[in-house]
From Swiss-Prot:
Formation of pseudouridine at positions 38, 39 and 40 in the anticodon stem and loop of transfer RNAs. This is tRNA pseudouridine synthase A. It comes from Kosmotoga olearia (strain ATCC BAA-1733 / DSM 21960 / TBF 19.5.1). Homodimer. Disulfide bonds: none annotated. It is an enzyme of class 5 (isomerase). The lineage of its organism: Bacteria, Thermotogati, Thermotogota, Thermotogae, Kosmotogales.
Length: 250
């Protein structure tokens, strides 16, 4: 038996998120269908991040155990890509220890959020950028982001309810203008709550337009109340860019 970790890129536009759901097209479901065709048996998988509907990935990591000992990582990569649809692609595969779990072994997760800051929309980019036609001040956004760095209770930035702790650690936020009209917000952390990154982006963009003062970020964080936060940024601008492990380079 071999355990593999696949580094996967996907266009999330036509998926109902990562996690398997009944009668829905999901990344995990489609990936497991490809594995079943290769193995002639159901093969369970374990992902590093549960991206929401419409969210993309460049560095999702999906682990699984195979009884096809003859297959090298390269052979497995080729077999998977031959059986996957054209909106998912395996970039590389690593052989990992039998107890490896990408969800729990991850040391850091890096998300990128892309914003098209133009007066007119670009229809060819509409699935991958949040079109934001208003002027924004990136320095104000950077000031606000500093309040979010470190370990905090991010209840105000959570959508929905679950049993997980709301204490999370953000290790870095970078706000860059890649080109004249493209803004990148890069958020790094150990793990995130549901829609946490999109909620952070929504707040930062409101700060950038002058709708909220940067120092108000601290009050919103400490309020532990989702209703204090502006609307979440849309899903289609978000990319799970990279997951970092000790075991291998992604």
């Amino acid at each position: 038996m071999k355990r593999f970790a696949a580094v996967v890129v996907y266009d999330g536009s036509n998926f109902f998120g990562y996690q398997i759901q009944p009668n829905k097209r999901t990344v995990q479901g489609v990936f497991e269908e490809a594995l079943e065709r290769i193995h002639k048996a159901k093969i369970p998988t374990d992902g590093a991040g549960r991206t929401d509907t419409g969210v993309h990935a460049y560095g999702q990591v999906i682990a699984f155990t195979s009884n096809l000992d003859r297959l090298t990582p390269k052979h497995m990569k080729d077999a998977l890509n031959a059986n996957l649809p054209d909106d998912i692609y395996v970039r590389r595969i690593h052989e990992v220890p039998s107890n490896f779990s990408p969800r729990f072994a991850a040391k850091k997760r890096i998300y990128h959020y892309y914003i098209l800051n133009t007066k007119e929309p670009d229809l060819f980019r509409r699935k991958y950028f949040w079109w934001f036609p208003y002027e924004v001040d990136l320095n104000r956004m950077r000031q606000a982001s500093r309040y979010l760095i470190g370990e905090h209770d991010f209840t105000s930035f959570r959508t929905g309810h679950d049993d997980r702790s709301t204490i999370r650690t953000i290790t870095g936020i970078r706000i860059l203008r890649l080109q004249k009209n493209i803004i990148l917000i890069r958020v790094e952390g150990i793990s995130f709550l549901r829609r946490m990154v999109r909620n952070i982006v929504g707040l930062l963009m409101r700060v950038g337009t002058g709708g909220i003062e940067p120092k108000k970020t601290k009050e919103i964080l400490e309020a532990r109340d989702r209703s204090k936060l502006p609307s979440s940024a849309p899903a289609h601008g978000l990319v799970l860019h990279k997951v970092i492990f000790d075991e291998f380079e992604t």
